[in-house]
Amino acid sequence: MENTIVQLSKYVITFLMICFTVQSFAALKERDEDERHYILMRQIIMIILMNFICFFVMFLQEGEVSTIQMFLLTMAYILGVQILYRLIYRKASMILVNNMCMLLSISMIILTRLSVSKAMSQYKILAASTLLCFIIPVIVRKGKFLKNLTWIYAVLGIAMLSVVMVLGFTSGGAKLSIEIHGITFQLSEIAKITLVFFMAGMLREDNSFGNVVKATVIAAVHVLILVASTDLGTAFVFFMAYVVVIYVATRKARYPLLGLAGMSAACVVAYFLFSHVRNRVALWQDPIGNWDISSQLAQGLFGMCSGGWFGTGLFEGRPDIIPVATKDFIFCAICEEMGIIFGICLILLCMSTFLLIINISMKMSKRFYKLIAMGLGTEYATQVFLTIGGTIKFIPMTGITLPLVSYGGSSMFSTVLMLSIIQGLYILREDEGEELEKRRNKKKRNQQKNDPGAKKKRRPDEETERRKKSGRRDDGQGNPQNLAVRIEEQTENSLHW
């Protein structure tokens, strides 16, 4: 009977994940508020059902009370976040909240399967991070001073990376973190956010060659410190954020092209300088033949293959024998017991989150906030690419964790902080939209008051259609609308591409 339930559950879980992923993209495209609300409600139901089924199956298999405790704690977190965001931040992006809750649910499920103690530790860090970051949207929304701290961001980021380089301990061939009173801190996770804020502040008003050089020098210092610490995966994340922000700010292709050329040369140099880089390239080329160097990549690939399209079912596989299954290779553990289809949906869900962040960036009228959203979105997408790409042998392994899914306190805190900043930008954009609409309505009322017969010249629906087709607005004098209004109208359909 238990085996039947386990085998049926994996198909139900896959179906729920497919439906949630499809609904996630549908919510991005949907413009009707009522229909979007129904989509979000359906997603919440799917999250609850998936958690219930997975934890119920694990309880049947093991009979541990700790499994029930983790289920109740996970449900308390998800429902608490949903309620608090709706009460405190009514303008927040609930699509982003739902995506975050689903990714965190997957994390809690697979970590409970692999190690209940690590799942509990992760939950404590998650709860504390969420509470600490709940004020971040208010700071982003009201904190006009943030754009004036440009050089403070630079000094803070360089200082944190330097401390790790000097005092950090080596793990996996790289200096990644420091330990204070038994607590490990990976300061590069915070530095990647301060770097984006620095570059946005530097290029928010002046994207001249001089400012580009300043931004390049500071970004290069960040990257070189990481290279000296042999943390090359994080260095690549920093570099990609730099390239994208520079291009968005200047719209000059030569800057990212020169950067990519420099990074390519640096990769060649790193290959000959660092032995662990050569080992990872050798594992990437032949994971079976280099089993004596490390078996983690081969074990991960075997695990995914043994799971097949729908997985073996929870507690029916052996993801526990995969080295660092809770961190770098958590995607392999997920695919082994939940299936490759589930893993593909997980990738698409991460892609949906990235598209949402980029869309928020596109709709920001102020360059400072636009560059922040673009930089943070790039870092998120790069981390997902490096983690999953390394575990499926698409690229050499980098040691980067999967955001919101892998075990790790610093990574969890920085990702929650990042998404809280994005929420603040989304709320700020909603405020700008409301203010813009008020100005439009006020101007329209003034025009009608000054010219009572004006509203009879053209019906409202015809006027709206004319504006959509022309992309211009007649202000009574035949002049085009100002830049902010034009950007607003042109980005209304930005998701329909």
Please annotate each region the language model reported.
Residues 1-17:
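Hydrophobic transmembrane alpha-helical segments in integral membrane proteins
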Residues 393-435:
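Transmembrane alpha-helices of multi-pass inner-membrane enzymes
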Residues 63-293, 332, 336-390, 417, ...:
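Hydrophobic alpha-helical transmembrane segments of multi-pass inner membrane proteins, especially
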Residues 36-39, 211, 326-333, 370, ...:
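Membrane-interface alpha-helices at helix entry/exit sites of multi-pass transporters
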Residues 22-39:
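Membrane-interface helix-loop junction between the first two transmembrane segments
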Residues 19-25, 81-83:
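Alpha-helical transmembrane segments
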Residues 287-327, 331, 340-342:
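TM-adjacent membrane-interface loops and short helices in multi-pass inner/ER membrane proteins
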Residues 432-472:
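Short, highly charged, low-complexity non-transmembrane loops/tails of multi-pass membrane proteins
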